[in-house]
């Protein structure tokens, strides 16, 4: 949609813009695993007409440093998975710093919970310098952007961002997504 609007306005695409748009599409679709349709592939095929190294983009998006790999292990070992299929983890500044990473260098952990078969939706809470939490919210089954809207965020139906100002906000967000999944699965609180 964004690509078509740019074309309709007469803006000229160049190789750098094509690479950046391709990077965004690859990231937003989880490397073409979700939130896509034939239009996505049509746009990508047009982007390939520009001179950029699309293989390098994929390589850079799928490789990580040793510290990033260690944080990945931590996330997988410490992820809380609720009976509803909702998973979440809180990454504090101290934890992120212990792996010699910064908040911006943790985007790679967002897809990790998707590798666990019982996980239907997940959230990564990343503490910010101001003491609030950036929320990366993803789902395979339920629409989560309306929940994200209630926490100063938004995004796609299955991939959104939000903000939790306090740990109470974290609890509320977890309860909301968990409750929505429980309703979808016809579960009751007793089955938790």
Regions found by a protein language model. Give the residues of each.
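Hydrophobic helix-and-loop "lid/oligomerization" segment in the mid-to-C-terminal part
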Residues: 22, 27-192
């Amino acid at each position: 949609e964004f690509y078509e609007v740019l074309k309709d306005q007469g803006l000229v695409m160049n190789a750098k813009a094509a690479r950046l748009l391709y990077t965004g599409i690859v990231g937003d679709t989880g490397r073409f695993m979700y939130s896509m349709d034939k239009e996505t592939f049509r746009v990508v095929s047009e982007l390939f007409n520009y001179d950029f190294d699309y293989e390098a983009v994929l390589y850079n998006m799928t490789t990580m440093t040793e510290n990033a790999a260690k944080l990945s292990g931590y996330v997988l070992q410490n992820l809380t998975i609720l009976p509803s299929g909702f998973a979440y983890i809180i990454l504090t500044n101290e934890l992120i710093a212990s792996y010699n990473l910064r908040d911006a260098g943790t985007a790679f952990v967002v897809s990790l919970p998707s590798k666990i078969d019982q996980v239907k939706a997940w959230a990564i809470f990343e503490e910010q310098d101001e003491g609030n939490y950036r929320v990366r919210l993803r789902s395979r089954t339920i629409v989560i952007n309306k929940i994200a809207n209630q926490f100063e965020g938004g995004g796609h139906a299955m991939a959104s961002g939000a903000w939790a100002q306090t740990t109470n906000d974290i609890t509320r967000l977890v309860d909301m997504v968990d409750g929505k999944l429980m309703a979808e699965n016809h579960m009751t609180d007793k089955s938790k």
